[in-house]
């Protein structure tokens, strides 16, 4: 049978397949023609009309799914990857970009003016390379279709952004395009028209994260896959069973009305495929039964995203050559890190988790019990105490120098408590290595603490403070105000709940605590009463940011105490995850970020607290 497939680059691929060929046979031939190895994200679509399509089932014969001849299909992205950077090959990302360009132009992926200009500039950079005034005319952007309603203002903005790019390769431009496109609310959403039980027109959207409900182009509800227990359809009705919430006792079923039985079945199949591909680690098959069975036997027969990533990791071939059709530029993909991590990408924000969240908790069947929950708390306190700058400071006497040397001593207190001699989870060698790494980390941290330097804000605040007194010449008296006090405390605690022993009624914890305190004190003058002054609070500010796996709370307080301005910054980072976390790496990262953000301040206190919960099997 003769087949005709419209590709994403507006070309047509024609071939002849056997009469009993299945959908996977044709898809495999198309991917071989395009030199695509990561083919599981793509599929072949049959278009009923201009807005409605049906995916070709890979496991069934083509002739049973197509009405009449000719056999016309389109090659499209079926499963939009949540993180395109994890795709192995640049050619896969390029075809994903082509699909997203079609989605934008057709209006399926709405964008703001600023986003359209940014994505359009990356499209031009990918197709044409760096701006060259000798090659590119005054309106070279008008040759590209970048938006549904493309205006001259948009083209001028695209040209302005494109001219600012220097030495950005096509692969880097594609990756930047995808990094911005994946943040759009309608990215990868498959839309289906429906009605609610009251007959109000709505649209149901299926994506990698779950089922979305839209009304008048606004999202009014969301059902993530972990909360969906069952998906079913009956005649033209579509039902989802929702897991009960914390305050609920029973499961709830929500129904929707679709235009026809065929539309309800198509929506059900799309939901099953998306749930299986993005949530499960492997596909399951229905065992063949000799008796008549009720219900649909449809199951997603392809590979899941987890299996696709495993297969992609085994790809061992040179980066393939492919032609960018818009400009007819032969492009060779970048190798390795240059494509995945371009040099001009912005660094990870400070509030982002230092450890990537593990997909283990998201994988699997919805409702599967989580066997291990782990919470990591890293608390970093940055404190700066500084004396006001003085114009004329007298040289200290020899007695004062000796007294200060005597007082600048080290007081170290180490308390060790081990309530259990035998660890049920770790060997003694592992415990010794862990403790040695913590001790080495503390030692390196204590040696690398920089001297605090006054910031410009505190200098101005101290100079104009109403609590400071000036003499006749306008100079600050040297005897007034308390001297500089430096304090530094490091506390690291490691607590784990051991697996239950043979006595079922009692849990014996393993507690290991080490405390190290180093204090530097300067001499106090007799007439100084700065410690009795509680100080005056100038400002207090709390900033909280959240990501999918961490919460960062930053509290900034500024006080004036006896003519001394004090700035205290306390940052609390709570990281939750279901995988083993490198505690030392988290601590090093937190200290490093605190020093980079506030180079003129010193870290005085670091507290690491770990909570591990192990449920009964």
Curated annotation (Swiss-Prot):
Alphabetical keyword list: Actin-binding, Calmodulin-binding, Cell cycle, Cell division, Cytoplasm, Cytoskeleton, Mitosis, Nucleus, Phosphoprotein, Transport
FERM domain boundaries: 1-282
Assigned GO CC terms: basolateral plasma membrane; cell cortex; cytoskeleton; nucleus; plasma membrane
GO function terms (MF aspect): actin binding; calmodulin binding; structural molecule activity
Cellular localisation: Nucleus; Cytoplasm, Cytoskeleton; Cytoplasm, Cell cortex
Compositional bias annotation for Low complexity: 348-361
Role: Protein 4.1 is a major structural element of the erythrocyte membrane skeleton. It plays a key role in regulating membrane physical properties of mechanical stability and deformability by stabilizing spectrin-actin interaction. Recruits DLG1 to membranes. Required for dynein-dynactin complex and NUMA1 recruitment at the mitotic cell cortex during anaphase.
This protein's name: Protein 4.1
